[in-house]
């Protein structure tokens, strides 16, 4: 992450509510220091690599449920649209085009809520592990993952280019920053810049973090520490299910700036 990294800012106007509800999507009301409530829905979903019809159907169902609960914002995991890890499917032009076509179709149906969805962005010949910001039927923003893991089971640098610009958006006057998976594991990564320079109230991290023994506790401790360090609410969503040798355990979290866990998703269950 270079010193010249820019932060893109967007303002979205939404009506906020404070009704307590719960369903297939986990819903949490976050009250910021400005005493404004934001209702956030978290979709801890089981994406299937390459099955765009299945993934789109799961996302659309969660959007309908979040709308029923009058959520302001809904989060989907890293590469929720394509499944993770797509690996050499990323080398197929048809796969990339289906991913982009599915995103456009998905965006057209997003109304009355802000949605963040993981997908693959393409710029000329370069691919980016990205998160799309969907609002009022359009893709209104895009964040490209800045820190790409290339160790153990991860081989992202083979397929993706690194992003160089952070993004913040505002809902009901609440500033929200966006990161993807590995971005949050680096204490001095993009999350720090978003929270210190853009003064984000909430930092979002969409993830595809595989399970191994002790990983849930390590991840939870890290997220709580980042919330304390950045002095921001941290909302984290993770995939569930399995793909090849990888198993994803979910364990999504909402954490207050003091490191207190507000709500926690189930393990190994949507």
Language model features by range: what are they?
Residues 2-270:
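Enzyme catalytic cores with a strong preference for nitrogen-chemistry domains
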């Amino acid at each position: 992450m270079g010193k010249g990294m820019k932060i893109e800012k967007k303002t979205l106007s939404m009506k906020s509510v404070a009704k307590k509800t719960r369903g297939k999507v986990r819903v949490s009301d976050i009250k910021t220091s400005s005493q404004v409530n934001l209702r956030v829905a978290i979709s801890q979903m089981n994406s299937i690599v390459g099955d765009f019809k299945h993934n789109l159907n799961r996302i659309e169902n969660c959007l309908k449920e979040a709308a029923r609960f009058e959520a302001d914002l809904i989060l989907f995991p890293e590469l929720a649209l394509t499944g993770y890890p797509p690996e050499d499917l990323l080398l197929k032009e048809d796969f990339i085009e289906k991913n982009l076509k599915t995103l456009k179709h998905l965006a057209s149906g997003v109304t009355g809520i802000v949605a963040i969805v993981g997908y693959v962005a393409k710029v000329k010949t370069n691919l980016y592990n990205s998160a799309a910001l969907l609002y009022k039927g359009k893709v209104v923003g895009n964040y490209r993952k800045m820190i790409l893991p290339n160790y153990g089971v991860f081989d992202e640098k083979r397929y993706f280019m690194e992003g160089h610009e952070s993004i913040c958006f505002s809902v009901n006057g609440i500033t929200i920053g966006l990161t993807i998976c590995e971005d949050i594991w680096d204490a001095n990564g993009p999350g720090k810049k978003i929270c210190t320079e853009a003064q984000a109230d909430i930092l979002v991290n969409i993830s595809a973090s595989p399970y191994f023994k002790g990983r849930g506790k390590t991840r939870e401790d890290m997220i709580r520490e980042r919330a304390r360090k950045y002095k921001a609410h941290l909302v984290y969503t993770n995939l569930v299910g399995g793909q090849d040798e990888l198993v994803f355990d979910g364990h999504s979290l909402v954490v207050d700036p003091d490191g207190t866990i507000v709500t926690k998703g189930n393990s190994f269950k949507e």
